[in-house]
Amino acid sequence: RIPYDRENTSMVDFPMCGYCEDQYTDLHNRRHHAQTISCHGCGPQLLWKTRDAACDMTEVPEGMTDDEHRTRDAAILDSAADILKSGGVIAFKSVGGYNLVADPLCDEAVHRLRIIKKRESKPFAVMFRNLDEIRSFSYISDTEAKLISSSARPILLLEHRESDSSEINRSRFIGSFLPSFAAQYMLLDRISPLIFTSANLSDMPMIKDESDMFDMFEKDPLIDGVLYNTRRILLRADDSVARVIDDQPQMIRRSKGYA
């Protein structure tokens, strides 16, 4: 809805604490009327569900300090990265829905992901930490670099360089993209690159709700964990896909960032 006010977004579930409200109402503060303003104390919380209930972090203790929140979040991301480094597959809650995440350089992980998705041969999109990492796998022009770095963060089809990875060499092009929000950046700081593909069965809608994701997690033992948060997803939005032809961007799938 318009205007883009907090009460019309999923942030309505997170009342501002006094510290955030002071900044929100201060005409001279850079966060004045920033509708998504929040902190560790009053904003969405990172949560983690695994096959081992003893390792779950599905609740946030009350009264935690900012440093304690940061330590807890780091522990969650470390645990998720450890699973990915060992060839596992996790579900990850992104802005517009859940993704399934795996290491594209690990044949076992890719094989497991194909079984989960019932997707025998179609290549997966790969998220890279930064442009330098993309350049180590693909050829990328200035126009392509500008598009892939834009705020819309589309998946961009790039011609790949030769690589030892069968997954990245599966097609002439790699569907490449960059992280678009903090949790993705922090996960890729721990392991990169990573396959990010929609959490669904082929030809089914992308999962956006915890109930559906947990149901899939319980039914499919090949998914090792669910990394999620307490912010509701109101509108499902998959990543947009584009390609640059004759130095002109061409949309293949118009969705997040463009729709």
Describe each region flagged by the PLM.
Residues 1-259:
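Active-site-adjacent structural elements in enzyme catalytic cores
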